[in-house]
Amino acid sequence: MKDSVLKDKRILAVDDEPDVLEVLREEITMAVPTCVVDTATSYDKAMELLASCTYDLAIFDIMGVRGFDLLRIAVNRDYPIPVVMLTAHALSPEFLKESIEKGARAYLPKSSLGHVVPFLEDVLTYEYGDVWRRILKNVEGIFSSSRGPYWRKPDEDFWKEFDEKIGKE
């Protein structure tokens, strides 16, 4: 069995729900014991950790911890941190678009936490376009069910340009 790309990595996970952080930590460290997962339940604690540690990857909840503010800070550092935006209540085309525009590397519904390890491995392994094509394949079904088949229509130009950027057919 080959080593995980998460081996010896350090991840920052930020969510205002301690249960979610515990699931993330357990899922990741059970699969990859040498991966360190630091957690924060607030924006302030996350800022403290970002200032004192070096991270290979970050996972930020969109709601409750100022996830978009943390995203902006993480991607605008001298050494940008790849960021996965995590969401349950903010699972919408609007928040997906904002995540993309602000530089997120990926977008993960909380309902997919059971698959977080292979998801994070993909984020660190695959190119930007490959990761986003996989994510869109997943969320398009969710959005089509909840919003109808024309969920892209309000931001049609953005989605067309993004599809071209990631090489989506």
Report residues per predicted region.
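Conserved acidic segment of CheY-like receiver
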Residues: 2-28, 39
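Acidic, metal-coordinating helix/loop segments flanking the phosphotransfer/catalytic sites
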Residues: 25, 39-57, 65
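Short amphipathic alpha-helix used as the core "switch/output" element in two-component signaling
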Residues: 48, 63, 68-81
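Two-component signal transduction core modules
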Residues: 58, 83, 107-108
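Alpha4 helix (beta4-alpha4-beta5 surface) of REC/receiver domains from two-component response regulators
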Residues: 69, 90-118, 136-137
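C-terminal output/effector regions of signal-responsive regulators
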Residues: 125-169
